[in-house]
């Protein structure tokens, strides 16, 4: 009996040992198959990205650069510049996140490489209402099986994000940035423009305070920023290549961008962020606003561009949504109204030139889109928009005027907003405005 039991026990041990060996073989085969299909796991990439955010927060340059291929000197230099620039910026949040599943794997030695879209998710302390993002394409490689993963290439994404890609940001564009902060403004400029940032920061601060006070006095509901991010550039080339890659020379003296909030696709719908999380202003110093003969010029353009930035946060439709395009006469007229310090629109510096245009055959009109390629037409269009907002404020009051602006930014058409807020049709408003303007400038 004892012999039988011993034989059975021995058989069980042998069977278990055989099964264990077979399981090891199956596990190894499964692991090999998984590695062949997925040689660089998303968990590894996420851990690498988390480490980048940690290194930036701790100002650990060595750790930040450790993930990049040391053989690629240009890449290491690029990322060294980026790290040192980012370290100067007051971020409330700054993390790197993987977007999507990445490209197909490509063989590399005994390993593989893959491309991933990486979002630099950030929130400027005191200036952004919600986190925003800038997107890059990273090439991540493992040159040999079992070896570490390294980043071998990084490039900014400039396509598929509408008119403005939000790349390159100042920290990408310039080797050395200067950051100048006031209570309500944050200048991020090329270090070569440090003196100009320091010179104009007080004027921008006064412009921000004036605009915020005007909006507050209007009593319109809605979350707006209490600070504004500004970059100064010299010339149209830089104006058209910061936060965007302009195909043509930009005609404007300054631009304000509403920056989309970073949207976590895994978040519940009731936790989705508003469409616009912040704004960025870029102003060209090589324009008449900054000539010695125009002492009020800097304040005028700061108030104008910050007016756009202030109400951008109210946006409640996608930027590329063409169902309710914004009427330029209203948005630019509002910016001109605040830019002119809410003074009578007839005091506008554009008025003398407009009178000449009208006497030479141009006509009054409220244009939904300005012809920026025709300077005389554009000047008249800005002036007409300004006069319309001035008329609206004079007849209906600033609060109603600001409500019209807010509702239009929230996605309502002008033809619907005017009856709703002012109890007047667009056609009747236009007729009354035109009659009013002709009487004022005759």
Placement of each model-derived feature along the sequence:
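A short hydrophobic beta-strand element
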Residues: 108-123
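Second-shell loop/turn segments in exported
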Residues: 35-39, 51-53, 186-202, 285-297, ...
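Short beta-strand edge/turn micro-motifs at domain boundaries
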Residues: 23, 122-176
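Beta/coil-rich, acidic/histidine-enriched accessory regions frequently appended to metallopeptidases
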Residues: 1-24, 73-76, 81-88, 376-380, ...
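Juxtacatalytic substrate-recognition/specificity segment
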Residues: 181-320, 414
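Short solvent-exposed beta->alpha transition segments
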Residues: 61-110, 418
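Short, low-complexity N-terminal intrinsically disordered segments enriched in polar/charged residues
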Residues: 3-58
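Acidic/His/Gly-enriched intrinsically disordered linker/tail segments
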Residues: 297-301, 306, 316-398, 402-442
């Amino acid at each position: 009996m004892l012999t039988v039991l011993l034989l059975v026990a021995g058989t069980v041990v042998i069977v278990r040992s055989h099964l264990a060996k077979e399981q090891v073989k199956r596990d190894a085969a499964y692991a090999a198959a998984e590695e062949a299909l997925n040689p660089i796991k998303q968990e590894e990439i996420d851990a690498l990205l988390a480490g980048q955010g940690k290194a930036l927060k701790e100002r650990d340059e060595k750790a930040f650069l450790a993930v990049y291929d040391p053989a690629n000197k240009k890449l290491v230099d690029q990322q060294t510049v980026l790290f040192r620039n980012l370290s100067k910026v007051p971020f409330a949040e700054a993390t790197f996140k993987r977007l999507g599943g990445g490209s197909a794997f490509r063989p590399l030695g005994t390993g593989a490489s893959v491309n991933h879209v990486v979002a630099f998710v950030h929130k400027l302390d005191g200036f952004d209402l919600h986190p925003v993002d800038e997107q890059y394409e990273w090439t991540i490689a493992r040159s040999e099986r079992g070896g570490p993963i390294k980043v071998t290439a990084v490039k900014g994404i400039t396509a598929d994000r509408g008119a403005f890609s939000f790349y390159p940001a100042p920290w990408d564009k310039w080797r050395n940035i200067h950051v100048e902060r006031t209570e309500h403004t944050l200048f991020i400029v090329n270090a070569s423009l440090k003196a100009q940032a320091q010179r104009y920061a007080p004027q921008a601060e006064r412009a921000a305070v004036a605009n915020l006070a005007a909006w507050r006095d209007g009593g319109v509901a809605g979350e707006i920023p209490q600070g504004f991010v500004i970059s100064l550039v010299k010339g149209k080339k830089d104006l058209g290549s910061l936060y965007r890659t302009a195909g043509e020379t930009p005609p404007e003296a300054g631009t304000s961008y509403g920056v989309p909030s970073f949207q976590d696709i895994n978040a519940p719908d009731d936790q989705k962020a508003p469409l616009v999380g912040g704004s960025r202003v870029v102003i060209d110093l090589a324009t008449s606003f900054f000539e010695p003969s125009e002492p009020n010029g800097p304040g005028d353009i700061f108030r104008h561009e910050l007016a756009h930035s202030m109400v951008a946060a109210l946006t409640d439709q996608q930027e590329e949504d063409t169902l309710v395009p914004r009427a330029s006469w209203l948005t630019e007229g509002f910016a001109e109204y605040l830019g002119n310090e809410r003074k009578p629109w007839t005091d506008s510096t554009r008025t003398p030139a407009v009178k000449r245009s009208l006497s030479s055959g141009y006509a009054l009109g409220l244009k939904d889109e300005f012809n920026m390629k025709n300077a005389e037409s554009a000047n008249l269009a800005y002036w007409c928009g300004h006069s319309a907002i001035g008329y609206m404020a004079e007849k209906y009051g600033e609060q109603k005027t600001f409500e019209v602006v807010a509702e239009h930014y929230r996605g309502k058409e002008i033809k619907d907003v005017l009856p709703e807020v002012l109890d007047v049709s667009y056609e009747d408003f236009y007729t009354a405005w035109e009659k009013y303007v002709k009487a004022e400038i005759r």
